[in-house]
């Protein structure tokens, strides 16, 4: 499945963090969709084209892991990247069992998150972009 403009779903209950990531990815040519919690993310994946989901671990209503599990039921091949300031080995192992593409510790750098997103898109869709901007 070839894609021209990847659509990224950024899911975090912190609106400033969502907007920061939007400001990282949109100037690089990505289309971004924003969700404040897991239920909103599920609605977006069911109704819009989404190529990758970035998920905060700690959100109201559904955790990032719960959201990941439900997203995979809707769209099994959707690459999902889990992010958290509070990571432990149990969370990382659970994310791997749920087929998360990657687990990132917040705060993440612009270069780090851009590289992981590109790797996920390359693996899932054979999509290639120019060099990452830091």
State where each predicted segment sits:
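Active-site beta3 strand of CheY-like receiver
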Residues: 48-54
């Amino acid at each position: 499945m070839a894609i021209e403009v990847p659509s990224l779903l950024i899911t975090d209950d912190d609106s400033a963090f969502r907007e920061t990531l939007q400001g990282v990815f949109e100037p690089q040519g990505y289309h971004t969709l924003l969700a404040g919690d897991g239920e909103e993310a599920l609605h977006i994946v069911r109704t819009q084209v989404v190529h990758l989901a970035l998920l905060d671990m700690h959100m109201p209503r559904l955790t990032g892991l719960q959201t990941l599990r439900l997203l995979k039921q809707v769209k099994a091949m959707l690459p999902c990247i889990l992010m958290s300031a509070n990571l432990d080995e149990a969370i990382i192992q659970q994310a791997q069992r749920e087929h998360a593409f990657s687990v990132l510790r917040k705060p993440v750098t612009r270069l780090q998150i851009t590289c992981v997103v590109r790797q996920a898109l390359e693996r899932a869709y054979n999509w290639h972009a120019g060099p990452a901007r830091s």
